[in-house]
Amino acid sequence: VCFGKLMYHPDTRSLPFSYLIAYNDVMYLVPGRNLTTVGLYRDIRKWPKRDKRPAGARKSVVNFDWLSPFTVGEILRGKKILEDLREASGEDVSTYNYHEYVIKNSSLRKGIKYYDIALRIYMGAVLKRHAPVEPTTTVGTGPWTDISGLLLPVSEEQRIIDDIISGEIETTHDLIERFEEINANYSEYRWAWSYRMILDYYGFTSLTEENVERVKSDYITARRAWIAEIKKDAAKEFRLGDVEEEVFRNFNDQLDKEVDFENQKLY
């Protein structure tokens, strides 16, 4: 999200979900701020509902997961960047410099917090969708990318390119079939990536029952913290007069119902 007059085209891919605020000649970066906004929460739920294409006539493959190996990979990098900045400059400085951006001390601390909340939400959500067993494939363990809404491992993107060059993929029909095949395997590819991520994050050697319960507990704590931050943002919008009281109350009621999904198993 950008505010003010930006004098150039910033590249903030390594610090996703951030605010950019131009003030005179200074570009302030607020990392991860958009993770806790009403706007993001609504978008997460709005875009899948707006896809009115008939199930049998969807020419484009669009994956609506807002937290995926693609976005979470960037969040991991963003969190590491912020931690490295803090390590290099110390915790008592008023601002940090990252390329051409200025990050306030409080913004950096909150950015690390918000990114960590997102990571824990992602890990818990994945465990709700897949049994905690060792992956059956190595596809997906590397970096991920996005092709017009199709989320896929970079290795699969490269395989598409190689097969087009070799003639294995000759027509647009062949290409669409490959896209659909990759999308059909998304859950397993995602699990291959997520399994390793969970082990690395927690320092586990395997996903024992005790370890799984710890991840799930952290997921619930993080999700409630996320909802609490969104409530704060909604209250701010209401105080500024941006929304009517009835809309504000209905939105809060919707957020209160989020606890119903905490322990829901989806596999």
Could you say what each language-model-derived stretch is?
Residues 98-190:
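Extended alpha-helical coiled-coil/bundle linker/stalk regions that scaffold oligomerization
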Residues 1-79:
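Glycine-rich hexapeptide-repeat left-handed beta-helix
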Residues 43, 62, 140, 187-189, ...:
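Acidic, low-complexity intrinsically disordered regions
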Residues 46-133:
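Extended alpha-helical scaffolding regions
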Residues 40, 59, 137, 184-186, ...:
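Intrinsically disordered, low-complexity regions enriched in Ser/Pro/Gly/Gln/His and often acidic
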Residues 51, 70, 148, 195-197, ...:
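Short, isolated positions within intrinsically disordered regulatory regions of eukaryotic proteins
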Residues 165-267:
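Charge-dense, extended regions
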Residues 48, 67, 145, 192-194, ...:
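Short linear interaction motif-like sites in intrinsically disordered regions of transcription factors
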